[in-house]
Amino acid sequence: MRLLLIVISSMLVAAQEPDWKAVDAEALHLLQRYLRIPSTNPPADTRAAAELFRAELAKVGLEAKLFAAGPNGQINLIARLPGRDKTKKPLVLMNHFDVVPVDRAAWSMDPFGGIVKDGSIWGRGALDMKGIGVMQLMAVITMKKYGIVPDRDIVLFATCDEESGGDLGVRWMLKNHAAELDAEYVLDEGGFGTRDVLQKGKLVFGISVAEKQPAWLRIRAKGTAAHGSQPIPDNANMTLLRAIEKAMAAPPSGKQHPVIAQMLAAVGGEMDSNKFTNAIQKNTLSLTTLKSGVGDPVKVNVIPSTAEATLDCRLLPGVNAEEFISEMRARINDPRVTVELITTIDDTPATSFTTPLFETLRRVIKHHHPTAEVTPMMVPYSTDSPKFRRKGLPAYGFTPMILTAPVLATMHSDEERIPIDQFHIGVRMMFDVIKSVF
């Protein structure tokens, strides 16, 4: 009898409510350590990041599998928290280890310092997406530590190269280890809560169900090399400039996407006009790089024979990328200019927003933010979600924080950061999601 009482007592202790003060402290310290790992892509060497996750999971008795996908430390990770109902397929919590490069001169602090200042934690990847990765990791660790068994298996999946298209990350894993990712749902980065992006003064929380297609293009112009002191009509630089101007003059995008209609209904019929809301309603083109010149360092007095630029084009779901590029070539209409697609297109339909998981996300958001208007959302940037949507899996973008426009603007920019209070709430929201039955 005494032994039975001890067993029952230990079970009750194991399943107690988490000590959230302790969880918050652990989560913040972990994020600081994670931000101090410069997992920049290129080269996407994610070994140190993967080892950090593996060590934290091991502390609570969870095994992490590491998958080497490339020769330069490109490591993907999978860990599984077992659930009760084995008839249900898992929920995949997906995040990525890699981050984009930084312009150190433009930061007021070390971008890989994990610095806490002014109520925020600063560093490359804080928003995209190491902060969310730690929310997912801490939700899994906390469930295990406190003896809480989820309804279904939870698979934590961290990838090495989302920032370069996922060829060694999600695509590689789906090709080589598909059984590890045989799931019913995927939860990724994407939607977020805001009071000043969709409509000022109104708390709207988006769950992303669709995103624009990245169509990265290289435009190359050819000309005649010459001495800079003697201008010529066949100057590759001038040809490139004219081609870019014509390329950027893209026609209107056409009819409204159904997800945008849902977002408009959520905000009362009209969204504020800003770079985010403008981008999600039309095809966009951004000139991102220019490359020209001869020599290293480049000689000012030499007219080069070639010049090139890259355009980051983002197309609405359903837009035919080949037709878009063909129309661009026709506008340029110059045999000296080539337009080349340099990325893989992932055009997939929107994920349904009537699933049990979507309703669970809505319920969790409303529990923590009762005044929030919850809506499906389209995002202008790309994630790894379409690679699962292409296979028929519902994939949702869920960034469980309320973020301001200035904070959102730090993604892929300088002084990247997230508010610490929202980070802590995000850990609890992620925990509530994976603890739920859906």
Stretches with model-predicted labels:
Residues 3-12:
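Sec-dependent N-terminal signal peptides
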Residues 16-104, 306-310, 322:
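N-terminal helical capping/dimerization or prosegment-like subdomains
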Residues 97-99, 158-166, 189-194, 225, ...:
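Acidic, glycine-rich active-site loops and adjacent beta-strand->loop/helix elements
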Residues 32-40, 54-63, 141-145, 178-179, ...:
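Sec-exported extracytoplasmic/periplasmic mature domains
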Residues 17-21, 36-44, 121-126, 226-230, ...:
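Second-shell loop/turn segments in exported
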Residues 14-16, 192-431, 435-438:
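Metal-dependent amide/peptide-bond hydrolase catalytic core
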Residues 175-192:
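A glycine-rich helix N-cap at a beta->alpha junction
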